[in-house]
């Protein structure tokens, strides 16, 4: 079983056991769903009862917990899901599947994806080659992703990389 981090419990909310999460996970609609099994601190297995957005936070309640005192123990802990439980649409990939991939530009390897930086409106691929490159992670620049061969093909846009 491979656990994927989807966020961190930063606080409680109210007195009925609601948890406030900070998450940059890109496919929240696939993990913050009723009856989704989550792993808190990679140990405690719980099940999501409800989910809602509140300001910049993701709010969840857990099955069997309806009091703040029952969930205080989870404050400050990371939340994970089993990778096999995430049902992504076609041509959607987890960051963990892309990180470490070789980047191909104009038929030449220009580096390896070291990280994906997620922001509210966009994401950046962090590519380490001759130097560090930051390029937008979107369909305008990424031509194809080959997960099985760990390769990401970038569209032929002049001046994007020093080759």
Tell me what each language-model feature is.
Residues 1-163:
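Short Lys/Arg-rich amphipathic alpha-helical segments
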């Amino acid at each position: 079983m491979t656990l994927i981090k989807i966020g961190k419990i930063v606080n409680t909310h109210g007195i009925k056991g609601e948890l406030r999460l900070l998450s940059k996970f890109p496919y929240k609609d696939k993990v913050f769903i009723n009856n989704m099994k989550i792993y808190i601190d990679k140990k405690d297995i719980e099940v999501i009862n409800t989910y809602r957005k509140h300001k910049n936070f993701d709010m969840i309640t857990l099955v069997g917990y309806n009091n703040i005192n029952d969930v205080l123990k989870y404050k400050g802990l990371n939340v994970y899901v089993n990778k096999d439980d995430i049902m992504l649409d076609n041509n959607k990939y987890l960051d963990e599947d892309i990180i470490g991939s070789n980047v191909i530009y104009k038929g030449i390897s220009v580096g390896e994806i070291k990280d994906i930086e997620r922001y509210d409106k966009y994401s950046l691929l962090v590519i380490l080659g001759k130097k560090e490159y930051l390029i937008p992670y979107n369909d305008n620049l990424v031509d194809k992703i080959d997960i099985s061969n760990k390769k990401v093909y970038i569209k032929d846009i002049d001046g994007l990389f020093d080759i």
